């Protein structure tokens, strides 16, 4: 899917790029697979902001995506490739032989009319969901479970792909897009192939209005605020930009650069063999 660019006739069109949506085959979602949900604006039940930078935006219907693929051994046909406003990847509408319809994250190269299947006996082809114990080593995979039966939790974004490196003692070693190498139970399911819409990374919003349309609010720098509002606020000029004694922090005082917030005793550390930065995990 290519990206459209424009002549700089206006300041907002100078750098903006759009997806051409040529891969979309159906514009309206399946009614039985959508629901509405009231927006929170990043506020909790007390009305306090718990997630900054969220608010406004166009109304969006939630597509109910099947991340578990529990209909094992039943063949499904791809009926359409659809747009989902709440994720970067496209969705594929499947219709099973018994008439049931579901959405899945559309892998790259999936075409309308393709036949898909899930389960241990499914062939290792693009779009099929298999347990890691039956996936051939070296294949690209996505939609990976962390706990058997919970549903896919990793590698679901546009263009995402992981690689099955090896299997040993009931675990599969997977190289994630971040570079991390992690052990996952070989009974966990994964989908063959790469997530589609890989050109999404080349889309440039180009103007503030597109961010607001997506529900993204402006982010204000702490250095530009007053001392009462942020630990880095105040001063003449850029006196608190991280030089000298001043440490850049979050609004709540946590160091912003280099400070590790992950718990050193986190239970899942034992499953990480190589970290994202390429260094081996100490307790692996």
What are these model-derived regions, one by one?
Residues 89-93, 101-103, 152:
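S1/OB-fold single-stranded RNA-binding interface
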Residues 1-87, 108-284:
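Basic, glycine/proline-rich low-complexity segments that contact nucleic acids
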Residues 99-111:
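Beta-strand/loop nucleic-acid-binding surfaces
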Residues 96-99, 177-178:
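Short acidic-glycine loop/turn motifs at beta-strand connectors
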């Amino acid at each position: 899917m290519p990206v459209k660019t424009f002549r700089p006739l206006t300041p907002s069109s100078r750098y903006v790029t759009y997806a051409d949506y040529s891969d979309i085959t159906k514009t309206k979602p399946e009614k039985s697979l959508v629901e509405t949900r009231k927006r929170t604006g990043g506020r909790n039940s007390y009305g306090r902001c718990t997630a900054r930078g969220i608010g406004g935006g166009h109304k969006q219907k939630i597509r109910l995506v099947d991340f578990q693929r529990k209909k094992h051994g039943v063949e499904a046909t791809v009926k359409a490739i659809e747009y989902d406003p709440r994720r970067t990847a496209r969705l594929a509408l499947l219709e099973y032989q018994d008439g049931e319809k579901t959405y899945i994250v559309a892998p790259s190269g999936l075409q309308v009319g393709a036949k898909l299947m899930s389960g241990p006996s499914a062939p290792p082809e693009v779009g099929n969901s298999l347990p890691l114990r039956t996936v051939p080593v070296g294949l690209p995979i996505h939609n990976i479970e962390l706990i058997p039966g919970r549903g896919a939790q990793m590698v679901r974004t546009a263009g995402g792909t992981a690689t099955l490196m090896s299997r040993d003692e009931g675990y599969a070693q997977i190289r994630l897009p971040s570079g991390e190498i992690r052990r996952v139970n070989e009974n966990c399911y994964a989908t063959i192939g790469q997530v589609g819409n890989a050109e999404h990374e080349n889309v440039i919003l180009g103007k503030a209005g597109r961010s607001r349309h997506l529900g993204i609010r402006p982010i204000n720098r702490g250095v530009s605020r007053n001392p009462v509002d942020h630990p880095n606020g105040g001063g003449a000029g850029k006196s608190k930009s991280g030089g000298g004694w001043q440490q850049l922090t979050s609004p709540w005082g946590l160091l912003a650069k280099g400070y590790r917030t992950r718990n050193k005793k986190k239970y899942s550390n034992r499953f990480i063999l190589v970290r994202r930065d390429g260094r081996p995990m100490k307790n692996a």
